[in-house]
Amino acid sequence: MATGRGSRYLLTIGRWRRSFGIAPQFRALAALVPGVSHVDNKSDFLGKRPHRRHPGILQLSCVRLPQALAEAGQLLLLGSAMPNMEKQVQALTNYLWSRHLPVEPEELQRRAVLLEKKILENADSCQTEKHHEEILHALRRTTYHWQELSYSEGLSLVYMAARLDGGFAAVSRAFHEIQARLPEFQPQTLMDFGSGTGSVTWAAHSTWGQSLREYMCVDSSAAMLELAEKLLKGGSGSGMPCVPGVFFRQFLPVSPKVQFDVVVAAFSLSELPSKADRTDVVQTLWRKTGHFLVLIENGTKAGHSLLMDARDLVLNGKEKSPLDPRPGFVFAPCPHELPCPQLTASKPLACSFSQAYYPIPFSWNKKPKEEKFSLVILARGSPEKANRWPRITQPVLKRPRHVHCHLCCPDGHMQHAVITARRHGRDLYRCARVSSWGDLLPVITPLELPPSAQDAQDAPES
């Protein structure tokens, strides 16, 4: 039974439930309405714009590569005359998606100790050398063999065909969030670590246009840098670049004296050989950050876990740069700085998002695709100024007269909210119904309500 204060969390579906015959276990789930209350109208958007354009809407429509970039990519691929390009693209795509992080020495040692204990329990203790061979064989069989990718001219072209469009879509979605929530922010400088084909530069230029006057692209592969420069120049080594002010380097500048308004590492941290290397790079990138640090990886458990490590490293960093002592906070996607509830759940899930895009037009690339990715955007300054609305972390389920939303909330918990017009008001119901996976839901939680409003909400319905 619901008691007193808890009664406000109950929802009666009534005639809908009787007509459709919901199973008892699903009735209990549908009756739960976690801590969502009324629509947050501090920005006074109600009455000025339709609900489908509420300020939490952040999803982009299907992303398309800039025409100059798509044509340059086509020209380079047609001129390469590489055999079986479609098969090579598919093989590299599958490999990059299924790739794991390298196993750390400490974890390898822990596995060896467990294997040794298991083998010794069931074997003759005199055969020490044989036991060592068994342990090594078992480790080789069960341990992921991570290898560093070395991008030659040919592999760089395959990577471009496989990842240019999807990478552009993911980065465009991240930049769109910054622009939509802070339209007054006009960055002038950008640094891209692990720049690859230069998709970050193109996405930034598409988002902020002429406000950006300097792009620093850093990649250890000379072949990748050469390819990125050709793409900027229409597919040739000569000519004027389509995006001015782009500079290329093979090594990450470590001096904290020069900062960039936006620093990006897209699908790059997972290419580093160890956790120590990732720690050093993230700390350097944060020192180089003037306003926003954007980190993007595959939407897998490995990618999400890696990003949460980087997030915690920045938030818990003891060292403060004397040149920029401003603290960091999470701008997106988390509405809090607490441990990720997706990772601490009994069955951990990757916090990921999806962006539709049109691929480079080739015979095997005709239909729109979806890029599934994880991201974290860290910002310098005070989190009090940030919007702390709950984030929708799964596709919204629209049902007759109610909507299911899975939310990551400002208190650091996941909530499954069932929103109805009767219980939560027409405005919040309409906002929830037009929202999508990845959007923010503009709500005031019960804890944020003034005492008079809370008392009214606690009162039983007649």
From Swiss-Prot:
It is found in: Mitochondrion matrix. The keyword Iron applies. Keywords: 4Fe-4S, Iron, Iron-sulfur, Metal-binding, Mitochondrion, S-adenosyl-L-methionine, Transit peptide. This is Ribosome assembly protein METTL17, mitochondrial. Residues 1-31 form a transit peptide. The keyword Protein biosynthesis does not apply. Associates with the mitochondrial ribosome (mitoribosome). One of its GO terms (cellular component) is mitochondrial matrix. Mitochondrial ribosome (mitoribosome) assembly factor. Binds at the interface of the head and body domains of the mitochondrial small ribosomal subunit (mt-SSU), occluding the mRNA channel and preventing compaction of the head domain towards the body. Probable inactive methyltransferase: retains the characteristic folding and ability to bind S-adenosyl-L-methionine, but it probably lost its methyltransferase activity. Its main location: mitochondrion. [4Fe-4S] cluster-binding is essential for its ability to promote assembly of the mitochondrial ribosome (mitoribosome). One of its GO terms (molecular function) is structural constituent of ribosome. The lineage of its organism: Eukaryota, Metazoa, Chordata, Craniata, Vertebrata. [4Fe-4S] cluster binds at residues 334, 340, 351, 408. Belongs to the methyltransferase superfamily. Rsm22 family. GO terms for biological process: ribosomal small subunit biogenesis; translation. It comes from Bos taurus.
